[in-house]
């Protein structure tokens, strides 16, 4: 039995085993999503925090690429963050330029998306790089196979559609040279249409593509964190983090937000201590009053006149 605390929601779990995709926590998280949040926490704060316990930093701006609702909703509470999708609204196509966002993002999250974007994948990676601030970073999970070479399934993809043919989806593509090609035996991840698998990465190829797109300090994560339910003893997408230029450091506004929240928490703790102290004083005062009353009752019980009245069934009954 594997016991762990989910680093997304903070709940305790006990599972007999993990698999690649099925959720292993009631919140919906799996090994892949918990690894993603672990990397994010370590890069932002230098320690492994539960996402639900992250400080609220609305000065930190971020974008999600098809993030799961179980952590996207919490990220939205914590940061100036919005989640987007490549296959449905709110749609965000990283293969197209977004000049209004250039240099504005502190981080981008991508969970098993890079294998789906249209070729060449460098176009999307370079756009992510362009949108990040100088200290910004990308955190991603990417399915990787063994070997060295990247395998592009459709290197000549240009104008294409996925159409049914005899009940089976096929890819119809018009290449740049005008040649028409039809491909069957398509691979889809979690759906159809835009979720078509475009390529198979290897760790070496992913590293090369990230560097070629301008990223620095590319780090792959394979360390088990059993207390958070992160185990790499089965097929898990490869977690990776890549910086734009500089190591990440919280900006002054974010540090000020943390200090304000700490002071607010400290004030609440001080008020709680005062309330507890006042409650203790009231309890002690009540105890003293009760003891004084009990002493007076004991004294009254020894009164000859009171005992006489009790013998005749008159007067107060004291115990």
Tell where the protein language model's regions lie, with residue ranges.
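A short acidic, Gly/Pro-enriched loop at the edge of an enzyme's catalytic core
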Residues: 95-109
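Boundary detector for helix-to-coil junctions that initiate low-complexity/charged tails
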Residues: 249-319
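N-terminal juxtadomain amphipathic helix
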Residues: 1-58
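Class I SAM-dependent methyltransferase SAM/SAH-binding core
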Residues: 48, 53-99
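S-adenosyl-L-methionine-dependent methyltransferase catalytic module, highlighting the catalytic core
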Residues: 4, 119-264
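A short SAM/SAH-binding and catalytic strip from SAM-dependent methyltransferases
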Residues: 106-119
């Amino acid at each position: 039995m594997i016991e762990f605390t989910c680093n997304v929601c903070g709940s305790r779990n006990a599972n007999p085993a993990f698999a690649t995709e099925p959720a292993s926590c009631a919140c919906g998280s799996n090994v892949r999503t918990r690894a993603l949040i672990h990397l994010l926490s370590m890069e932002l704060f230098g320690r492994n925090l539960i996402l639900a316990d992250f400080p609220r930093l609305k000065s930190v701006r971020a974008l999600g690429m098809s993030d799961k609702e179980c952590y996207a909703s919490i990220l939205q509470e914590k940061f100036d963050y919005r989640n987007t999708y490549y296959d449905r609204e709110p749609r965000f196509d990283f293969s197209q330029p977004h000049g209004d966002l250039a240099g504005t993002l502190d981080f981008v999250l991508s969970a098993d998306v890079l294998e789906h974007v249209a070729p060449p994948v460098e176009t999307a990676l370079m756009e992510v790089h362009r949108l990040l601030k100088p200290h910004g970073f990308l955190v991603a999970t990417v399915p990787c196979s063994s070997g060295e070479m990247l395998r592009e399934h459709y290197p000549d993809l240009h104008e294409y559609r996925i159409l049914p043919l005899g009940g089976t989806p096929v890819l119809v593509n018009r290449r740049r040279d005008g040649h028409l090609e039809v491909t069957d035996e398509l691979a889809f991840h979690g759906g159809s249409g835009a979720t078509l698998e475009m390529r198979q990465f290897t760790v070496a190829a992913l590293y090369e593509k990230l560097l070629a797109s301008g990223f620095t300090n590319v780090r792959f994560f394979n360390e088990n964190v059993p207390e958070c339910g992160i185990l790499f003893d089965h097929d898990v997408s490869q977690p990776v983090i890549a910086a734009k230029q500089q190591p990440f450091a919280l900006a002054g506004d974010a540090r000020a937000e943390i200090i304000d929240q700490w002071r607010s928490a400290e004030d609440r703790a001080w008020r709680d201590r005062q309330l507890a102290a006042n409650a203790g004083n009231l309890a002690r005062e009540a105890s003293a009053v009760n003891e004084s009353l009990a002493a007076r009752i004991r004294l009254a019980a020894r009164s000859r006149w009171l005992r006489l009245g009790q013998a005749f069934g008159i007067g107060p009954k004291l115990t």
